[in-house]
C-alpha cells in the first residue's frame, strides 16, 4: 500500500490491485490539497546521531512545507507521539547523499514546528490527516537520544563492602 501511495504521489500511471483501490482513492481525496515536493529521501541528523528516509515533504495551500509520514496501521493515535518524534527528526535533518557524503539543507519554507501524519488504515477505504506538534516531537526525540547516550556510558565503580 505504501509503495502505491508513492507511485501516485510521483504521478506514475499504475495498476492498483482491487483490494487497494478504495484505500488509494481515499488517499488521493484526502491529500488532494497537498503538493508533494519530495518523497522517500534519505536524511541525517548529526546532533541526534539519527538517519532515515522520510515519506513525504509536502507543500500546504498556504505555501509552507511540512514533513508527512504515512501510517497504514489500524490506530493512528496509538503511535502519535512516536510519529511526532520521527517526523521531527526528519524535519530537523539534512538531506544526505550517501555516495558523495554530501549534506544539503531543506528549503527555507520548511516548517519544523508542524508535521502531518497521513493515516491510511489498510483495507478500510479511508484516509485521515492529523497535525503533529514537531516542537514536542523534537523535545521527545532529544530526550530519547540523551537516554540512549546515558545507557552507553560506563557507570562509576563504587567499592562496596558488607562490613562497612
Where are these regions (language model features)?
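Metal-dependent nuclease catalytic cores that hydrolyze phosphodiester bonds in DNA/RNA
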Residues: 1-51
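Mg2+/Mn2+-dependent nuclease catalytic core
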Residues: 38-160
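Replication-associated primase and helicase/ATPase modules
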Residues: 162-164
Amino acid at each position: 500500500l505504501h509503495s502505491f501511495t508513492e507511485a501516485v504521489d510521483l504521478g506514475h500511471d499504475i495498476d492498483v490491485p482491487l483490494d487497494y483501490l478504495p484505500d488509494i482513492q481515499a488517499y488521493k481525496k484526502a491529500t488532494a490539497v497537498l503538493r508533494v515536493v519530495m518523497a522517500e529521501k534519505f536524511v541525517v541528523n548529526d546532533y541526534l546521531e539519527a538517519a532515515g528516509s522520510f515519506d513525504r515533504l509536502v507543500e500546504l495551500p498556504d505555501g509552507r512545507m511540512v514533513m508527512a509520514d504515512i501510517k497504514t496501521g489500524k490506530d493512528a493515535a496509538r503511535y502519535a507521539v512516536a510519529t511526532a518524534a520521527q517526523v521531527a527528526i526528519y524535519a530537523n535533518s539534512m538531506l544526505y547523499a550517501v555516495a558523495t557524503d554530501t549534506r544539503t539543507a531543506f528549503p527555507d519554507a520548511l516548517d519544523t514546528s508542524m508535521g502531518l501524519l497521513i493515516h491510511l488504515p489498510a483495507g478500510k477505504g479511508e484516509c485521515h490527516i492529523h497535525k503533529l506538534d514537531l516542537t514536542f516531537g523534537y523535545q521527545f526525540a532529544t530526550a530519547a537520544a540523551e537516554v540512549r547516550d546515558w545507557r552507553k556510558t560506563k557507570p562509576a565503580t563504587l567499592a562496596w563492602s558488607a562490613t562497612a
